[in-house]
Amino acid sequence: MTRKKFYLVREDMLTEAMQKTLEAKALLESGKKRKINEAVHEVGLSRSAFYKYKDGVFPFHTMTKEKIITLSINLEDRSGSLSAMLATVAEAEANVLTINQTIPLQGRANITLSIDTATMSLEIDELVEKIESMEAVEKVELVGSGS
């Protein structure tokens, strides 16, 4: 199987059908339209053109921002430390998908967080730095990332 190549193309360089496909996909993803027929009708696109382009055109933010990262965090066992760390993640507008905490041993617990960074207001390294700078945090490692 050959690897697909991706190109960054300015919006005004796209064909009208490609632009309308992106509009129709946005209507479907937002829930404003539930059926493909409704979405293509609203934007003035044929269904055949939609199906031709739907798997080939994506908004730039989708290609760059839809990432899930996994962080491993060593945290001191203090009242409110986990809550404060999660508040830092929330302030960055990241979405916690999973959280796993070991039982604190010798005053330390390991937290594993899976985070969706698609809507995050910070870069990943900035979030890691913010978490690392917290008083109760001993260590933060990015152990996985992908889309």
Swiss-Prot record:
SUPFAM superfamilies: ACT-like. Residues 70-145 form the ACT domain. InterPro entries: ACT-like_dom_sf, ACT_dom, UPF0735_ACT_dom-cont. CDD domains: ACT_PheB-BS. Belongs to the UPF0735 family. NCBIfam families: PRK04435.1. This is UPF0735 ACT domain-containing protein BH1214. It comes from Halalkalibacterium halodurans (strain ATCC BAA-125 / DSM 18197 / FERM 7344 / JCM 9153 / C-125) (Bacillus halodurans). The lineage of its organism: Bacteria, Bacillati, Bacillota, Bacilli, Bacillales.
